[in-house]
Each structure stands twice: as structure tokens, then as C-alpha cells.
């Protein structure tokens, strides 16, 4: 009888933990983050790698591709003001700018409010000092894009670790390295003067952050 009671208590506790985990509210990114972001296709092709800066309060994002590790004639430099729905493609070498509307404003730098908490796991070892990282895994859908996503953040601090995007036209994997809770120069979120007066180029309603990355 005591064994049955004990099993019932254990089962109830496990159910409570599982319920709490599944109903965990999405965490919020720190006010400022910066570091290295690498994007690859699920086929293993390196698409982009460079430095990112993110202002979570203003919802502004800057990504500058690392020119030293890309065999290309042009390199990505984008500034996105998600709240305003504006995407700038910047060419600092030629001082030119392209400005597009961005109707779909969700992205993987911030966990969407309707994301589901999947699990909390250790990467590496949980028992050896400084040899492990506890992360939370979130997932959800972007119905407008006919896509779904998964994101991993640090358990404490909500720093980005990795993310994946699976859509009808592409599959992407994002990795984040050397993430800091600061941005050295806040001017990275301000479009250059030569972007002023540039006319908007209309984009489809499903134009998104994820369209930036392709083979």
C-alpha cells in the first residue's frame, strides 16, 4: 500500500513538472546582444557568417557578413527595423542603399509569444565544471510562411544558442557564438545618410527575415 502511495506521489510530481515545462512562458532577449551568427542550409551549405547586433527593446537588427570567409563579389550588410517593417540592404563601399518593406516581422532573435516550451536540456556534461550548458528548446509555427521553427536559448539569460527554420522553399540552421549582452556602437542601428530619400521597393506580403539567406 505504501509503495502504491509512493508511486502515485512520484507520478503526480512528474506530471506537475511536465505541465510546468510545457506551459513555461517564452523568455525575452536581453536589451542588447551581439556576437557571431552563422547560417547554413540543412544540406550543409554555408550561406552566411558574420557579426550581428540586436536591440530587443527597439526590435532592430544588424548583420554584417564576414568578408574574410566568403568567396563572393558582394557581401551582406543588412539593417532591419522590425517594428517599422523596413529592411535596408547597405553597400558601404559604393555608398548605396536599397530599402524594402517587410510585412512579416517575426524572426529568430526573439522568441515569438506563442512559442511552445519543448524541453530543458544540458549540452555537454552537467556534472563537470564548465563543461556543460543548460538550454531551453522552444518551437512553433509561422502559418503565414507555411513554416515551423525551433529555437534554443540559454536557460539563464535567454541568450540565443541555435535555431532552425523549415519552410516550403528552404530549410535553414542558425548558430550563435561569442554572444555578449552589449553592443559597442549603437550607431549600427541607424541607417547611413545615403539611405535617406531612397524610395521603398515594394515586397510580397510574405517577404521575411528568412528570405535574406539563400544559396
Swiss-Prot record:
Main localisation: secreted
List of glycosylated residues: 71, 94
Range of residues in the leader sequence: 1-20
Alphabetical UniProt keywords: Calcium, Disulfide bond, Glycoprotein, Secreted, Signal
InterPro entries in the record: Ependymin, Ependymin_CS
Disulphide-bonded residues: none
Pfam families: Ependymin
Ion transport is among the record's keywords: no
UniProt similarity note: Belongs to the ependymin family.
Function noted in UniProt: May play a role in neural plasticity. May be involved during axon regeneration.
Record note on quaternary structure: Forms disulfide-linked dimers.
Protein name as annotated: Ependymin-1
Biological source species: Carassius auratus
Name of the gene: epd1
